[in-house]
Swiss-Prot record:
Family statement drawn from the similarity comment of this UniProt entry: Belongs to the MatP family.
Protein name: Macrodomain Ter protein
Localization per record: Cytoplasm
Keyword Zinc appears in the UniProt entry: no
InterPro entries recorded: Arc_rbn_hlx_hlx (IPR013321), MatP (IPR009390), MatP_C (IPR035375), MatP_N (IPR035087), MatP_N_sf (IPR038339)
HAMAP family reported for this sequence: MatP (MF_01073)
Function summary: Required for spatial organization of the terminus region of the chromosome (Ter macrodomain) during the cell cycle. Prevents early segregation of duplicated Ter macrodomains during cell division. Binds specifically to matS, which is a 13 bp signature motif repeated within the Ter macrodomain.
Pfam family, one: MatP
Keywords: Cell cycle, Cell division, Cytoplasm, DNA-binding
Molecular function per GO: sequence-specific DNA binding
Length: 150
């Protein structure tokens, strides 16, 4: 496993995930009966400051259909958490107008690259174009100087 699991921290994430899903109207418990489901949800809500007990609640009451989705969410959150510790792995955000993002996404798709790789490639293309333009300008000046001397 690449990223260390931190039980207390991840239990808090699981609690937040389940509460968010409940507030969005999803069934987070395995119970069909509304009163049993509400009782289990109330128990979960009371565990906000008891991260160790959240895992027990999950084993006992959670809807089995949520298991894989929650695992994926926690795995992604763990990755972001550890990547945020280092400057070179931390995700950055930039504000783009929708049309710019749309064009960039289309270009990335056509090139078969990620958005980041496409941006780097565009920067390199612009730098190479600039170097080429400078070189051509220099050659033109040298040629004019040679022709002017004769």
């Amino acid at each position: 496993m690449k990223y260390q699991q931190l039980e207390n921290l991840e239990s808090g994430w699981k609690w937040k995930y389940l509460v968010k899903k409940h507030r969005e109207g999803e069934l987070i418990t395995r119970y069909i009966e509304a009163s049993a489901a509400q009782e289990a949800v109330d128990e979960l809500l009371s565990l906000e400051n008891e991260p160790v007990l959240v895992n027990g609640w999950i084993d006992k009451h959670m809807n089995p259909e949520l298991v894989n989705r929650m695992k994926q969410t926690i795995r992604a959150r763990r990755k972001r958490h550890f990547n945020a510790e280092h400057q070179h792995t931390r995700k950055k955000s930039i504000d783009l107008e929708f049309i710019v993002w749309h064009r960039l996404a289309g270009l990335a798709q056509r090139r078969g690259k990620t958005l980041s790789e496409t941006i780097v490639q565009l920067i390199e293309d612009a730098e190479n174009k600039e170097k080429y333009a400078n070189k051509m300008s220099s050659l033109k000046q040298d040629l004019q100087a040679l022709l002017g001397k004769e």
